[in-house]
Protein backbone atom coordinates (compact mmCIF):
# COMPACT_ATOMS: atom_id res chain seq x y z
CA UNK A 1 0.00 0.00 0.00
CA UNK A 2 1.34 3.45 -0.96
CA UNK A 3 2.43 5.70 1.89
CA UNK A 4 0.68 9.05 2.16
CA UNK A 5 2.60 12.24 2.87
CA UNK A 6 1.24 15.74 3.43
CA UNK A 7 3.62 18.62 2.73
CA UNK A 8 2.46 21.81 4.44
CA UNK A 9 3.95 25.17 3.40
CA UNK A 10 2.81 28.78 3.77
CA UNK A 11 1.91 29.85 0.21
CA UNK A 12 1.45 28.19 -3.16
CA UNK A 13 4.34 30.23 -4.58
CA UNK A 14 6.57 28.46 -2.05
CA UNK A 15 5.51 25.09 -3.42
CA UNK A 16 6.17 26.16 -6.99
CA UNK A 17 9.61 27.62 -6.31
CA UNK A 18 10.97 25.43 -3.51
CA UNK A 19 9.16 22.06 -3.37
CA UNK A 20 8.72 21.05 -7.02
CA UNK A 21 11.70 18.69 -7.17
CA UNK A 22 10.93 17.06 -3.81
CA UNK A 23 7.27 16.49 -4.71
CA UNK A 24 8.22 14.92 -8.04
CA UNK A 25 10.83 12.66 -6.41
CA UNK A 26 8.32 11.54 -3.75
CA UNK A 27 5.80 10.69 -6.49
CA UNK A 28 8.52 8.70 -8.32
CA UNK A 29 9.12 6.79 -5.09
CA UNK A 30 5.42 5.83 -5.09
CA UNK A 31 4.30 8.15 -2.30
CA UNK A 32 0.80 9.60 -2.43
CA UNK A 33 1.54 13.32 -1.99
CA UNK A 34 -0.80 16.06 -0.72
CA UNK A 35 0.43 19.66 -1.05
CA UNK A 36 -1.27 21.85 1.57
CA UNK A 37 -0.83 25.60 1.02
CA UNK A 38 -2.61 28.96 1.03
CA UNK A 39 -3.63 30.85 -2.11
CA UNK A 40 -4.39 28.23 -4.77
CA UNK A 41 -5.87 29.20 -8.12
CA UNK A 42 -7.31 26.76 -10.65
CA UNK A 43 -4.08 27.15 -12.64
CA UNK A 44 -1.76 26.39 -9.72
CA UNK A 45 -3.91 23.42 -8.72
CA UNK A 46 -3.42 22.05 -12.24
CA UNK A 47 0.35 22.50 -11.93
CA UNK A 48 0.44 20.53 -8.66
CA UNK A 49 -1.69 17.77 -10.22
CA UNK A 50 0.67 17.67 -13.23
CA UNK A 51 3.42 16.72 -10.77
CA UNK A 52 1.30 13.77 -9.64
CA UNK A 53 0.26 15.33 -6.30
CA UNK A 54 -3.03 16.59 -4.89
CA UNK A 55 -3.49 20.28 -3.94
CA UNK A 56 -5.20 21.11 -0.63
CA UNK A 57 -6.00 24.63 0.60
CA UNK A 58 -5.31 26.10 4.05
CA UNK A 59 -5.71 29.65 5.35
CA UNK A 60 -2.68 30.01 7.64
CA UNK A 61 -1.53 33.35 6.27
CA UNK A 62 2.21 34.03 6.44
CA UNK A 63 2.02 37.69 7.47
CA UNK A 64 -1.06 37.49 9.71
CA UNK A 65 -0.29 38.35 13.35
CA UNK A 66 -3.74 37.41 14.67
CA UNK A 67 -3.19 34.56 17.19
CA UNK A 68 -6.90 33.74 17.31
CA UNK A 69 -6.99 33.16 13.54
CA UNK A 70 -3.84 31.01 13.77
CA UNK A 71 -5.43 28.93 16.54
CA UNK A 72 -8.57 28.45 14.43
CA UNK A 73 -6.36 27.32 11.52
CA UNK A 74 -4.64 24.74 13.75
CA UNK A 75 -7.97 22.94 14.13
CA UNK A 76 -8.98 23.43 10.49
CA UNK A 77 -5.70 21.89 9.30
CA UNK A 78 -6.16 19.09 11.85
CA UNK A 79 -9.54 18.35 10.27
CA UNK A 80 -8.01 18.23 6.77
CA UNK A 81 -5.27 15.89 8.00
CA UNK A 82 -7.84 13.59 9.62
CA UNK A 83 -9.58 13.40 6.22
CA UNK A 84 -6.34 12.76 4.31
CA UNK A 85 -4.96 10.38 6.97
CA UNK A 86 -1.27 10.74 5.99
CA UNK A 87 1.45 8.45 7.33
CA UNK A 88 3.92 11.36 7.32
CA UNK A 89 3.63 15.15 7.57
CA UNK A 90 6.42 17.49 6.46
CA UNK A 91 5.97 21.11 7.58
CA UNK A 92 8.16 23.82 6.05
CA UNK A 93 8.90 27.46 6.99
CA UNK A 94 8.06 29.28 10.21
CA UNK A 95 4.27 29.31 10.53
CA UNK A 96 3.60 25.78 9.24
CA UNK A 97 6.38 24.37 11.45
CA UNK A 98 4.86 26.09 14.49
CA UNK A 99 1.12 25.69 13.89
CA UNK A 100 0.64 22.89 11.34
CA UNK A 101 2.96 20.60 13.31
CA UNK A 102 0.58 20.93 16.27
CA UNK A 103 -2.30 20.17 13.87
CA UNK A 104 -0.53 17.00 12.78
CA UNK A 105 0.05 15.93 16.38
CA UNK A 106 -3.62 16.51 17.24
CA UNK A 107 -4.60 14.52 14.13
CA UNK A 108 -2.58 11.55 15.36
CA UNK A 109 -0.09 11.50 12.46
CA UNK A 110 2.55 8.81 13.09
CA UNK A 111 5.60 10.74 11.84
CA UNK A 112 5.98 14.53 11.77
CA UNK A 113 9.08 16.27 10.40
CA UNK A 114 9.64 20.03 10.35
CA UNK A 115 12.03 21.84 8.03
CA UNK A 116 13.21 25.26 9.23
CA UNK A 117 14.53 27.04 6.14
CA UNK A 118 15.98 30.09 7.84
CA UNK A 119 14.92 31.63 11.15
CA UNK A 120 13.18 34.59 9.52
CA UNK A 121 13.21 38.35 9.94
CA UNK A 122 12.91 38.23 13.73
CA UNK A 123 16.37 36.63 13.98
CA UNK A 124 17.99 38.70 11.22
CA UNK A 125 20.54 41.33 12.33
CA UNK A 126 20.04 44.95 11.32
CA UNK A 127 22.44 47.89 10.87
CA UNK A 128 19.99 49.97 12.94
CA UNK A 129 18.27 48.99 16.22
CA UNK A 130 15.05 47.04 15.80
CA UNK A 131 11.80 48.33 17.25
CA UNK A 132 9.51 46.90 19.90
CA UNK A 133 7.35 45.04 17.35
CA UNK A 134 10.33 43.07 15.98
CA UNK A 135 11.48 42.15 19.49
CA UNK A 136 7.97 41.06 20.44
CA UNK A 137 7.68 38.87 17.32
CA UNK A 138 10.99 37.19 18.15
CA UNK A 139 9.89 36.57 21.75
CA UNK A 140 6.59 35.06 20.60
CA UNK A 141 8.30 32.98 17.91
CA UNK A 142 10.70 31.44 20.45
CA UNK A 143 7.81 30.81 22.86
CA UNK A 144 5.80 29.06 20.13
CA UNK A 145 8.82 27.01 18.99
CA UNK A 146 9.18 25.76 22.56
CA UNK A 147 5.62 24.45 22.32
CA UNK A 148 5.69 23.05 18.77
CA UNK A 149 9.19 21.66 18.17
CA UNK A 150 8.98 18.98 20.90
CA UNK A 151 5.94 17.55 19.06
CA UNK A 152 8.11 16.80 16.00
CA UNK A 153 9.88 13.51 15.45
CA UNK A 154 12.70 15.36 13.70
CA UNK A 155 13.64 18.96 12.91
CA UNK A 156 15.68 19.74 9.78
CA UNK A 157 17.84 22.85 9.41
CA UNK A 158 19.64 24.15 6.33
CA UNK A 159 22.68 25.51 8.17
CA UNK A 160 24.37 24.74 11.51
CA UNK A 161 24.13 28.31 12.84
CA UNK A 162 20.32 28.23 12.77
CA UNK A 163 20.32 24.96 14.66
CA UNK A 164 22.70 26.13 17.38
CA UNK A 165 21.04 29.53 17.79
CA UNK A 166 17.50 28.21 18.02
CA UNK A 167 18.01 25.00 19.98
CA UNK A 168 21.06 25.71 22.14
CA UNK A 169 20.90 29.45 22.74
CA UNK A 170 17.19 29.36 23.52
CA UNK A 171 17.24 25.94 25.20
CA UNK A 172 14.54 24.31 23.05
CA UNK A 173 14.11 20.55 23.38
CA UNK A 174 13.69 18.43 20.25
CA UNK A 175 13.62 14.65 19.88
CA UNK A 176 16.02 14.68 16.94
CA UNK A 177 17.55 17.20 14.53
CA UNK A 178 19.80 17.29 11.47
CA UNK A 179 21.46 19.86 9.20
CA UNK A 180 20.82 19.01 5.53
CA UNK A 181 22.74 21.93 4.00
CA UNK A 182 20.31 23.42 1.46
CA UNK A 183 17.35 22.22 -0.57
CA UNK A 184 19.45 21.84 -3.71
CA UNK A 185 19.18 22.70 -7.38
CA UNK A 186 18.32 20.74 -10.52
CA UNK A 187 21.68 20.66 -12.28
CA UNK A 188 20.07 19.82 -15.62
CA UNK A 189 17.75 22.83 -15.55
CA UNK A 190 20.49 25.20 -14.34
CA UNK A 191 23.17 24.34 -16.85
CA UNK A 192 26.79 25.45 -16.77
CA UNK A 193 27.98 28.17 -19.13
CA UNK A 194 31.63 29.21 -19.19
CA UNK A 195 32.27 32.82 -18.20
CA UNK A 196 32.38 35.33 -21.05
CA UNK A 197 35.17 37.78 -20.23
CA UNK A 198 35.40 39.48 -23.63
CA UNK A 199 32.92 42.17 -22.55
CA UNK A 200 32.62 44.38 -19.46
CA UNK A 201 32.04 42.53 -16.19
CA UNK A 202 28.39 42.47 -15.13
CA UNK A 203 26.80 41.88 -11.72
CA UNK A 204 23.32 40.63 -10.87
CA UNK A 205 21.11 40.89 -7.78
CA UNK A 206 18.15 38.52 -7.70
CA UNK A 207 15.53 38.63 -4.97
CA UNK A 208 12.92 40.71 -3.19
CA UNK A 209 14.00 44.33 -2.89
CA UNK A 210 14.17 44.33 0.91
CA UNK A 211 16.66 45.87 3.31
CA UNK A 212 17.55 42.50 4.84
CA UNK A 213 18.40 41.09 1.40
CA UNK A 214 21.16 43.70 1.13
CA UNK A 215 19.59 45.68 -1.70
CA UNK A 216 20.74 49.03 -0.29
CA UNK A 217 24.34 47.81 0.04
CA UNK A 218 24.19 46.49 -3.54
CA UNK A 219 22.93 49.83 -4.87
CA UNK A 220 25.48 51.89 -2.94
CA UNK A 221 28.33 49.62 -4.02
CA UNK A 222 27.13 49.81 -7.64
CA UNK A 223 27.20 53.61 -7.51
CA UNK A 224 30.76 53.57 -6.14
CA UNK A 225 31.94 51.14 -8.82
CA UNK A 226 30.29 53.12 -11.65
CA UNK A 227 32.28 56.20 -10.60
CA UNK A 228 35.45 54.32 -11.55
CA UNK A 229 34.20 51.87 -14.19
CA UNK A 230 31.22 53.50 -15.87
CA UNK A 231 30.63 50.69 -18.39
CA UNK A 232 29.99 48.06 -15.71
CA UNK A 233 26.47 46.61 -15.81
CA UNK A 234 24.38 46.00 -12.70
CA UNK A 235 21.18 43.99 -13.16
CA UNK A 236 18.44 43.84 -10.54
CA UNK A 237 15.69 41.24 -10.85
CA UNK A 238 12.90 41.26 -8.32
CA UNK A 239 9.77 42.99 -7.16
CA UNK A 240 9.14 45.67 -4.57
CA UNK A 241 7.09 44.14 -1.77
CA UNK A 242 4.89 47.14 -0.99
CA UNK A 243 3.42 45.49 2.10
CA UNK A 244 6.81 44.87 3.68
CA UNK A 245 8.06 47.70 5.93
CA UNK A 246 11.70 47.07 4.96
CA UNK A 247 11.08 47.28 1.20
CA UNK A 248 12.85 49.96 -0.80
CA UNK A 249 10.64 52.65 -2.30
CA UNK A 250 9.75 52.93 -5.97
CA UNK A 251 11.12 56.49 -5.89
CA UNK A 252 14.56 55.35 -4.72
CA UNK A 253 14.65 52.57 -7.31
CA UNK A 254 13.70 55.02 -10.05
CA UNK A 255 16.53 57.34 -9.00
CA UNK A 256 19.10 54.58 -9.59
CA UNK A 257 17.48 53.74 -12.93
CA UNK A 258 17.47 57.41 -14.01
CA UNK A 259 21.11 57.80 -12.94
CA UNK A 260 21.94 54.74 -15.12
CA UNK A 261 23.47 52.89 -12.17
CA UNK A 262 21.31 49.80 -12.66
CA UNK A 263 19.34 47.93 -15.31
CA UNK A 264 15.95 46.96 -13.90
CA UNK A 265 13.68 44.78 -16.04
CA UNK A 266 11.48 44.16 -12.98
CA UNK A 267 9.85 40.81 -12.36
CA UNK A 268 10.75 38.41 -15.17
CA UNK A 269 10.04 34.76 -15.90
CA UNK A 270 13.23 34.19 -17.93
CA UNK A 271 15.58 34.56 -14.95
CA UNK A 272 18.16 32.15 -16.36
CA UNK A 273 18.71 34.32 -19.44
CA UNK A 274 19.79 37.19 -17.20
CA UNK A 275 22.00 34.95 -15.07
CA UNK A 276 23.72 33.70 -18.24
CA UNK A 277 24.40 37.32 -19.27
CA UNK A 278 26.04 38.10 -15.92
CA UNK A 279 29.45 37.24 -14.52
CA UNK A 280 28.93 37.74 -10.80
CA UNK A 281 25.94 36.91 -8.60
CA UNK A 282 25.67 39.25 -5.61
CA UNK A 283 23.65 38.57 -2.46
CA UNK A 284 24.67 40.90 0.42
CA UNK A 285 21.94 39.44 2.65
CA UNK A 286 21.80 39.85 6.43
CA UNK A 287 20.83 36.20 7.02
CA UNK A 288 19.51 33.22 5.04
CA UNK A 289 18.71 29.53 5.36
CA UNK A 290 20.85 28.52 2.39
CA UNK A 291 19.70 30.72 -0.52
CA UNK A 292 18.33 28.75 -3.46
CA UNK A 293 19.04 31.63 -5.84
CA UNK A 294 22.75 31.42 -5.01
CA UNK A 295 22.76 27.65 -5.52
CA UNK A 296 21.18 28.16 -8.96
CA UNK A 297 23.75 30.82 -9.90
CA UNK A 298 26.56 28.51 -8.79
CA UNK A 299 25.20 25.69 -10.94
CA UNK A 300 25.29 28.07 -13.91
CA UNK A 301 28.95 28.90 -13.29
CA UNK A 302 28.68 32.35 -11.72
CA UNK A 303 31.17 33.90 -9.33
CA UNK A 304 29.49 34.59 -5.96
CA UNK A 305 29.79 37.71 -3.81
CA UNK A 306 27.97 37.31 -0.51
CA UNK A 307 28.13 38.07 3.20
CA UNK A 308 29.68 36.37 6.22
CA UNK A 309 26.35 35.42 7.76
CA UNK A 310 24.48 32.14 8.41
CA UNK A 311 23.28 30.55 5.17
CA UNK A 312 25.23 32.80 2.81
CA UNK A 313 28.70 31.71 3.92
CA UNK A 314 27.72 28.08 3.15
CA UNK A 315 27.80 28.91 -0.58
CA UNK A 316 31.32 30.34 -0.94
CA UNK A 317 34.84 29.13 -0.35
CA UNK A 318 36.48 32.54 -0.06
CA UNK A 319 38.78 33.17 -3.02
CA UNK A 320 37.85 29.88 -4.73
CA UNK A 321 34.40 30.53 -6.24
CA UNK A 322 33.91 34.09 -5.04
CA UNK A 323 34.32 36.26 -1.98
CA UNK A 324 32.69 36.69 1.41
CA UNK A 325 32.39 40.26 2.70
CA UNK A 326 31.30 41.59 6.11
CA UNK A 327 27.56 42.15 6.44
CA UNK A 328 26.38 45.79 5.99
CA UNK A 329 29.73 46.77 4.38
CA UNK A 330 29.16 48.74 1.18
CA UNK A 331 32.86 49.64 1.07
CA UNK A 332 34.17 46.05 1.09
CA UNK A 333 31.47 44.91 -1.33
CA UNK A 334 32.51 47.63 -3.80
CA UNK A 335 36.18 46.74 -3.30
CA UNK A 336 35.56 43.09 -4.24
CA UNK A 337 33.53 44.16 -7.27
CA UNK A 338 36.41 46.35 -8.41
CA UNK A 339 38.88 43.51 -7.79
CA UNK A 340 36.86 41.22 -10.08
CA UNK A 341 36.65 43.91 -12.76
CA UNK A 342 40.40 44.47 -12.62
CA UNK A 343 41.19 40.74 -12.50
CA UNK A 344 38.50 39.37 -14.78
CA UNK A 345 40.75 36.59 -16.06
CA UNK A 346 40.05 34.90 -12.69
CA UNK A 347 36.31 34.75 -13.42
CA UNK A 348 36.53 31.66 -15.65
CA UNK A 349 38.13 29.42 -13.01
CA UNK A 350 36.02 30.85 -10.19
CA UNK A 351 32.83 30.23 -12.17
CA UNK A 352 33.92 26.66 -12.93
CA UNK A 353 34.62 26.14 -9.23
CA UNK A 354 31.09 27.34 -8.42
CA UNK A 355 29.65 24.67 -10.70
CA UNK A 356 31.80 21.96 -9.10
CA UNK A 357 30.73 23.00 -5.59
CA UNK A 358 27.08 22.95 -6.71
CA UNK A 359 27.54 19.44 -8.15
CA UNK A 360 29.16 18.15 -4.97
CA UNK A 361 27.09 20.01 -2.38
CA UNK A 362 23.77 21.13 -3.87
CA UNK A 363 22.64 18.38 -6.26
CA UNK A 364 18.88 18.23 -5.62
CA UNK A 365 18.71 14.52 -6.44
CA UNK A 366 21.16 13.67 -3.64
CA UNK A 367 19.55 16.06 -1.17
CA UNK A 368 16.06 14.71 -1.90
CA UNK A 369 17.28 11.14 -1.34
CA UNK A 370 18.49 12.24 2.08
CA UNK A 371 15.22 14.02 2.89
CA UNK A 372 13.10 11.05 1.75
CA UNK A 373 15.18 8.64 3.84
CA UNK A 374 14.65 10.92 6.87
CA UNK A 375 10.90 11.09 6.24
CA UNK A 376 10.78 7.30 6.03
CA UNK A 377 12.82 6.58 9.19
Which residues does each predicted region cover?
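A conserved mid-protein helix/loop that constitutes part of the nucleotide-sugar donor-binding site
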Residues: 16-21, 201, 205, 210-224, ...
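Glycosyltransferase donor-sugar binding loop
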Residues: 35-42, 206, 233-248
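Donor nucleotide-sugar binding/catalytic pocket of nucleotide-sugar-dependent glycosyltransferases
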Residues: 56-57, 142-192
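Aromatic "clamp/platform" in nucleotide-sugar-dependent glycosyltransferases that forms part
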Residues: 267, 286
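Short hydrophobic beta-strand element within catalytic cores of glycosyltransferases
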Residues: 303-306, 316
Amino acid sequence: MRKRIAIIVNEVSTLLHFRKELVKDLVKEQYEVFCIAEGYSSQTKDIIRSWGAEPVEHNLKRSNLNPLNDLVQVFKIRKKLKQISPDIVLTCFVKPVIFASISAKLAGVKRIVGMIEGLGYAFTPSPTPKGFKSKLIKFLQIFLYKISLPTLDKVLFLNPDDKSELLEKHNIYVKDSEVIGGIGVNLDDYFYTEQNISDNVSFIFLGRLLKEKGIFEFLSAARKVKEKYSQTKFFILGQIDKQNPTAMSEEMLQTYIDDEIIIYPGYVTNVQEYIVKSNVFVLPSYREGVPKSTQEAMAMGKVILTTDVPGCKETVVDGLNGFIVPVFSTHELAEKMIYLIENKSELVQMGYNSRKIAENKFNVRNINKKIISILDE
